[in-house]
Amino acid sequence: MAAGLPPDALGRRGSCGTDYGAVRYVGSVSRTAGIWLGVEWDDPQRGKHDGSYEGTQYFKCRHPKGGSFIRPNKANFGVDFLTAVKDRYGLNDKQDVQYGTGNTVVFGTKTVEFVGMDSVAEQQRQVQLNKLVDISVRECAVSHAGQEEEISRTCANMRHINLSKNLISSWETVIAIASQVQNLETLNVSENKMRFPSTSTLISSTFSNLKVLALNQTEITWTEVLLCAQGWPVLEELYLSSNNITVLERPDNVLQTLKLLDLSDNQLLDGNQLHLIAQLPRLEQLILRNTGISSIHFPDARFGCKTEMFPSLKRLAINDNKISQWSSINELDKLPSLRALQCNNNPFMDTEKNPETLIQLIIAKISQLEVLNNCEILPAERRGAELDYRKIFGKDWLEAGGHWNPEKNKPSEEFLASHPRYPALCLKYGAPEEGELKGRQPLTLKNQLLTLTIKCPEKPEQKAVEKKLPESMTIQKVKGLLYRLFKIPGSELKLSYESSKLEGKEVELDNDLKPLQFYSIESGDCVLVRW
């Protein structure tokens, strides 16, 4: 074995410069002298081959160009946890001079010797380490725990540890470090490609106080998550992005305290996988960004009813997915606690070219939503969205069997499947009147654009802006636009306008359901906003 090469090098994580990888082979290579390490690199572009050389397969790689051979002296197998902490926080032996550890001091012509200065410096280091509560040793080449109980003696007050992007090879190493931290609450071991237990292990109290755990890019599977989770009795936040998790399983008797789950950047088999985690009783936030899901369905609840799945879910992120049908957005109204939604970059959003109408449709379809794509939904904006929705689809409602007379009102199942909230909106605002029922008008050149100046006369700090708006745009939609434009808090807007042709005359825009053209507004006029 080469000098300095760890006896357990095979299978361990290591680095060479800024590149990380796992040792898959230790030994000789044909027609060369000495020992070589066969490394499968995290970044395949760093490699040269699949583990074979001159017709001999020395090790296997997942990528055809993911492997190469390096000499042992080029490999860094890392340091123990405490060494990394001392290096990161400037508390190792090299910094002893700042504590005055020289043994002699000269006073004039006399040299005075101070006995025990080394031990004093060591005590001062101990005190400094014991004060650390939040510790980050990200990218510090940590590979093992070090001497037994050394961490617990030295860093007794740690609560939050960032161990991301190191050289940790197995979950056992994480346990060896964490078991010496009595009150560990937050642990980040992301970007360590490590081995996890494949069978049930003895449950220890290592993570008895752990509330936040990040395992992004660790190659953990959902089965391994559930096995390890037996030791996470009070965990509240679990981050699992970019782990190639495709299939979920029901978490029986584990993760019952979980409030946040991040599964982003894992290509789930289908949306039905979500049903397997739908009974987590305390889950409030679910992050499913870029998981490949194309539909969402809660089959236990009919139109207009609430599902028993995800009973506590308040915040849902489904952005960057393949959801193409509005029916999935309809389904989200079945979630009893949903308050915030992120859904950008899904194909269904391309079905409506006017972004204002798109936002209104989503708001109208999900009754309890308060935040959409990180923007607060104000009461006036919701009211306008629901009134417009009720009007836009009024003709479809009538043709499907809807009627102003409750006894004759029998819309078809097909209509209710497409517009499950429509009956509730009719109850809330009344059935639409015949004069309101105009077909949907796409925003085209036929809808004349008005160039208007928008001012806030009572708010001089707000600069006037110029906007182009279709003359068919209702006052309610204009208000929704202005709420976002001026970031106005939840209050009632009052709009009026001054004509460029009639100086000094101000006309109040007092009917939310009327379009701009109803008030004879023309390009060049000035809209005045007050609140």
Question: Which residue stretches match the model-derived regions?
Answer:
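A short beta-strand micro-motif
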Residues: 11-16, 39, 452-456
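Long, contiguous C-terminal flanking segments immediately downstream of a protein's structured core
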Residues: 63, 72-269, 273-531
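Histone-fold and other basic nucleic-acid-binding segments
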Residues: 9, 35, 57-70, 75-77
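Short coil-to-beta transition motif at edge beta-strands of beta-rich domains
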Residues: 3-20
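Short beta-strand-centered aromatic/proline hotspots
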Residues: 19-29
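Short alpha-helix capping/helix-loop boundary micro-motifs
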Residues: 1-7, 511-515
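Basic/aromatic-rich interaction segments and small domains that mediate binding to polyanionic partners
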Residues: 27-62
